[in-house]
């Protein structure tokens, strides 16, 4: 072959190699990139429903979902938090994150730009105002005495834009200076007349701000899902679909939801308002006592239990004979070394010791926070009845080590067809379910107020 032909052949071969190397078909798929990187990058929002830090530890519903998915893939998780949802979508388009997990509503506009996972929650969107500040409007046409403020780029912003000029009297604006939680707080302070918020965010904030009142619902049954980039590469998208299918069918998704939101759905204005009032007026006289005798427990948890038991009344007495700050029975008081149940310090010390005893009796394999919820239920109903409910749970195919499963079976202890086959018999099993739920709400409120420097 002539030299010139050889040279031409070499050039053509090199060019073909370059073209092949640059061809989209040879690019690694998204899953391969994640596994090669050994890191899953997840964009999220910093807020109480998605992602936050508690004692320097990453926490949040979206964090728990993402961490479990990363573990499933065998890679590390890198949460990429932002305060603005627009920044998250920009990062997703640029390939700076693999997924956005931020409690996103799957709107029609967003669905044209991104792919969404199967929904893992359903929420509603509500117009909120401060109770007592104005007459409750029943629809958007009746909002003539103020302005609605929403977060720019949010699904609420998208909804208001979709109205166009159909309601000429409606005044609204979008802001990038405040997030959804701040807008709810500004409703309470009077800086904002109305806002639109997701039902889950409202459930959480009403524990601290009971005067947040729902005017009406603007959207029902909105799917919440993860967002992924559009494109022909289905590798990571398929893994996400498989993941949500698995955690839904196994009950793990319900378990994670219960851990984060299982106690916030029930709201009682009077109960919450009275609790906040007691925190301000009564609790300061007992904080040091709770701290002194909490031992390995969180003093705020001990205080929450005490409020549920006695409303922090050291002389409380029930018709069944339990009495004091921690409402101890006489046998329990004697076993815990309490001489006077009406002595606040002795009662708190005895209650703390008894709760620690219940914690030690809960099987060590049960992780937190379920371990604590089981111990609190036992504090209320007795360890024997709790074990009966766990046995019923297992017989019915539930997980006896998950509070979300056991709390569904505790009320069955009232029914003869179930309690006749148990060791300890009849019990008012619905009471510890309410008991634990109330304490979780009080505990979360105390933690929030403490972090705000209000205790």
Curated annotation (Swiss-Prot):
CDD domains listed in its UniProt record: MLTF-like, PBP2_YfhD_N
Catalytic residues of the enzyme: 309
Protein's UniProt keywords contain S-adenosyl-L-methionine: no
Annotated keywords: Cell outer membrane, Cell wall biogenesis/degradation, Lyase, Membrane, Signal
SMART domains: PBPb
InterPro entries registered for this protein in UniProt: Lysozyme-like_dom_sf, MltF, Solute-binding_3/MltF_N, Transglyc_AS, Transglycosylase_SLT_dom_1
LT domain: annotated segments: 265-455
Signal peptide: 1-21
GO biological process, one term: peptidoglycan catabolic process
Membrane topology (UniProt): Peripheral membrane protein
A cellular-component GO term for this protein: cell outer membrane
Protein's cellular compartments: Cell outer membrane
GO molecular function, one term: peptidoglycan lytic transglycosylase activity
Catalyzed reaction equations: Exolytic cleavage of the (1->4)-beta-glycosidic linkage between N-acetylmuramic acid (MurNAc) and N-acetylglucosamine (GlcNAc) residues in peptidoglycan, from either the reducing or the non-reducing ends of the peptidoglycan chains, with concomitant formation of a 1,6-anhydrobond in the MurNAc residue
EC number(s) on file: 4.2.2.n1
Region Non-LT domain, annotated ranges: 22-264
Keyword Membrane recorded: yes
Family, as annotated: In the N-terminal section; belongs to the bacterial solute-binding protein 3 family.
Biological role stated in the UniProt entry: Murein-degrading enzyme that degrades murein glycan strands and insoluble, high-molecular weight murein sacculi, with the concomitant formation of a 1,6-anhydromuramoyl product. Lytic transglycosylases (LTs) play an integral role in the metabolism of the peptidoglycan (PG) sacculus. Their lytic action creates space within the PG sacculus to allow for its expansion as well as for the insertion of various structures such as secretion systems and flagella.
Domain notes: The N-terminal domain does not have lytic activity and probably modulates enzymatic activity. The C-terminal domain is the catalytic active domain.
Name assigned to this protein: Membrane-bound lytic murein transglycosylase F
UniProt organism field: Idiomarina loihiensis (strain ATCC BAA-735 / DSM 15497 / L2-TR)
């Amino acid at each position: 072959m002539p030299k010139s032909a050889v040279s031409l052949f070499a050039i053509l071969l090199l060019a073909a190699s370059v073209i092949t190397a640059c061809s989209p078909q040879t690019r690694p798929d998204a899953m391969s990139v994640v596994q090669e990187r050994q890191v899953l990058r997840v964009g999220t929002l910093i807020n109480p429903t998605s992602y936050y830090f508690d004692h320097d530890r990453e926490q949040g519903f979206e964090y728990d979902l993402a961490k479990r998915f990363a573990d499933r893939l065998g890679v590390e998780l890198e949460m990429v938090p932002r305060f603005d949802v627009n920044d998250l979508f920009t990062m997703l388009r640029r390939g700076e994150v693999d997924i956005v997990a931020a409690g996103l509503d799957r709107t029609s506009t967003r669905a044209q730009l991104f792919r969404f996972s199967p929904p893992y929650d359903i929420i509603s969107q509500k117009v909120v105002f401060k109770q007592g500040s104005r007459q409750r409007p029943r629809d958007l046409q009746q909002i003539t005495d103020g302005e609605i403020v929403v977060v720019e780029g949010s699904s609420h912003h998208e909804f208001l834009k979709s109205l166009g000029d159909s309601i000429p009297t409606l005044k609204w604006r979008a802001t990038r200076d405040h997030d959804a939680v701040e807008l709810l707080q500004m409703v309470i302070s009077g800086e904002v007349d109305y806002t639109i918020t997701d039902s889950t965010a409202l459930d959480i904030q009403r524990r601290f701000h009971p005067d947040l009142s729902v005017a009406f619902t603007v959207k029902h049954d909105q799917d919440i899902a993860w967002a992924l980039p559009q494109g022909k590469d289905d590798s990571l998208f398929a893994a996400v679909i498989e993941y949500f299918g698995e955690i839904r069918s196994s009950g793990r998704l319900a378990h994670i939801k219960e851990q984060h939101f299982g106690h916030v759905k029930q709201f009682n204005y009077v109960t919450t308002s009275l609790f906040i009032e007691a925190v301000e007026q009564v609790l300061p006289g007992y904080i040091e006592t709770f701290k002194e005798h909490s031992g390995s427990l969180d003093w705020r948890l001990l205080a929450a239990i005490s409020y549920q038991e006695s409303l922090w009344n050291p002389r409380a007495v029930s018709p069944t004979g339990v009495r004091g700050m921690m409402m101890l029975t006489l046998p329990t008081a004697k076993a815990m070394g309490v001489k006077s149940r009406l002595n606040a310090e002795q009662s708190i010390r005895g209650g703390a010791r008894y709760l620690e005893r219940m914690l030690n009796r809960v099987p060590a394999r049960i992780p937190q926070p379920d371990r604590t919820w089981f111990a609190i239920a036992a504090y209320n109903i007795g360890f024997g009845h709790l074990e009966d409910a766990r046995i019923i749970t297992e017989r019915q195919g539930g997980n006896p080590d998950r509070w979300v499963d056991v709390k569904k079976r505790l009320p069955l202890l009232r029914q003869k067809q179930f309690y006749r086959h148990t060791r300890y018999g009849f019990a008012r099993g619905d009471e510890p379910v309410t008991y634990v739920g109330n304490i979780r709400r009080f505990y979360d409120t105390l933690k929030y107020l403490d972090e705000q420097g209000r205790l």
